Amino acid sequence: MQQPVVRVGEWLVTPSINQISRNGRQLTLEPRLIDLLVFFAQHSGEVLSRDELIDNVWKRSIVTNHVVTQSISELRKSLKDNDEDSPVYIATVPKRGYKLMVPVIWYSEEEGEEIMLSSPPPIPEAVPATDSPSHSLNIQNTATPPEQSPVKSKRFTTFWVWFFFLLSLGICVALVAFSSLDTRLPMSKSRILLNPRDIDINMVNKSCNSWSSPYQLSYAIGVGDLVATSLNTFSTFMVHDKINYNIDEPSSSGKTLSIAFVNQRQYRAQQCFMSIKLVDNADGSTMLDKRYVITNGNQLAIQNDLLESLSKALNQPWPQRMQETLQKILPHRGALLTNFYQAHDYLLHGDDKSLNRASELLGEIVQSSPEFTYARAEKALVDIVRHSQHPLDEKQLAALNTEIDNIVTLPELNNLSIIYQIKAVSALVKGKTDESYQAINTGIDLEMSWLNYVLLGKVYEMKGMNREAADAYLTAFNLRPGANTLYWIENGIFQTSVPYVVPYLDKFLASE
């Protein structure tokens, strides 16, 4: 059933085609703005709060106050239509909300079409037909432009002579100035000073023919994420995990850790090696060069050897707390680690389909290995994020809340950041921003990761602190640049307008 046509002030609003029109002029608005205008018309003369607008226009979507404010501003601009004499359509009532200030008339669809068809285009004011012929003649004569006087024409010519003279003089001065500049000045883009404490993690070759490609790629992504998070949390190095970032651009990082999968003949057979190379960009020297043959059970041993080799190459001893953390977050079997990293890779993507798949894989891991409690916690995190985007039914939500209550009390998960990530998202979904803020800051104290800073940005945005939110989002993208992190910023928990909240990041990505 089509929505009825309504006249709001001078504008005829046709919701079925998302158009407003007046005096023969038609404007097409976004569906959300049309819904907002129709809701104002349905409550003409009433003061509507932001919460009422969110509940009735945005319905089940989670939006912030600035989204409502921005939509009201766009609607006001469209209704004004560059008309300085336009009446005030929507007034702001301080500390109350907004109010429609113009009269409203409702029509049926047929009446609205007749009104639109019968509305003539604006025409200039006509001369009355009862005037005398002599009067008409006078009107016609006055409409004829008078001849330009010679004095005015002469002044006009003098003006253009001086204008072109000064323009030519300015061009000559500019050419002389440009010719005197030293054109051999260095380009600023090429002057990048390396930071020896920064490390980039890149992936060169992503697959081998002799090993299942999805497992191979997700294993490398998981190892890279673990190395980046460990160094960022337990050392003074700043690591940028660029495995998901495919832009070839200059970097200021003093070191580069490259992961590649290569086929090489060994003992008359082709084998797939995972090559790990750490290069010091200051002098081009190789600090670490290792190759691993991955089998179905040595994934955990390879990862432990890599961490130990990095510790020696970087002269960075691993603290005891890191050793304890790794014991809690990693399984004790290599084959299980590959399955866990595949589920974790889906979590990194962040979209609905990937989160659903991550929940399924983690559920299988928990069922087959109930002693791996960290997988249970990560499944709870995935499920609460899914609930924030597509609310679960009452039975599913009750089961999830019970599972979360059980997980946060497990002693083997004490002092792990994932517990506070779960608490932060759960509180944020319920609108408890202060509780969420406290939880995610505790999580950041325990672990410096891109996901923690994405969640911190979401909390700041809900608190109306967009400047702090922009800093948090930029930190997250700096730690793990790429499409995955950008998707989390734009769509995780609730939708974020990157051009509005993080304009620098929007311009940076547009320059690619």
UniProtKB/Swiss-Prot annotation:
Changing residue 477 to I: Is almost pH-insensitive. Decreases inhibition by cadaverine. GO terms for cellular component: cytosol; plasma membrane; protein-DNA complex. The chain crosses the membrane at residues 155-180. Changing residue 30 to R: Enhances the DNA-binding affinity and induces constitutive cadBA promoter activation independent of pH and lysine. Residues 3-102 bind DNA. Residues 181-512 are periplasmic. CDD domains: trans_reg_C (cd00383). Contains a functionally important disulfide bond, which may provide structural support for the pH-dependent activation via a switch of the sensor between the inactive and active state. This is Transcriptional activator CadC. GO terms for biological process: positive regulation of DNA-templated transcription; regulation of DNA-templated transcription. PROSITE patterns: OMPR_PHOB (PS51755). Changing residue 64 to A: Strongly affects DNA-binding. Abolishes activation of the cadBA promoter under all tested conditions. Disruption phenotype: Loss of Pcad activity. It comes from the Bacteria. Disulfide bonds join 208-272. InterPro entries: CadC_C1, OmpR/PhoB-type_DNA-bd, Sig_transdc_resp-reg_C-effctor, TPR-like_helical_dom_sf, WH-like_DNA-bd_sf. The keyword Secreted does not apply. The record marks 265, 268 as: Essential for the stimulus-dependent interaction with LysP. Changing residue 265 to K/S/Q: Is inserted into the membrane properly and can induce cadBA expression in the presence of lysine but not in absence of lysine. It comes from Escherichia coli (strain K12). It is found in: Cell inner membrane. The keyword Cell inner membrane applies. Changing residue 447 to Q: Decreases inhibition by cadaverine. Changing residue 229 to A: Decreases inhibition by cadaverine. GO terms for molecular function: phosphorelay response regulator activity; protein homodimerization activity; transcription cis-regulatory region binding. Changing residue 172 to A: Retains wild-type activity, induces expression of the cadAB operon only at low pH in the presence of lysine. Contains a cytoplasmic DNA-binding N-terminal domain, a transmembrane domain and a periplasmic C-terminal domain. A cluster of aromatic amino acids within the transmembrane domain is important for lysine-dependent regulation of CadC. The transmembrane domain of CadC is important for the interaction with LysP, but the periplasmic domain of CadC is also important in facilitating correct positioning of the two proteins.
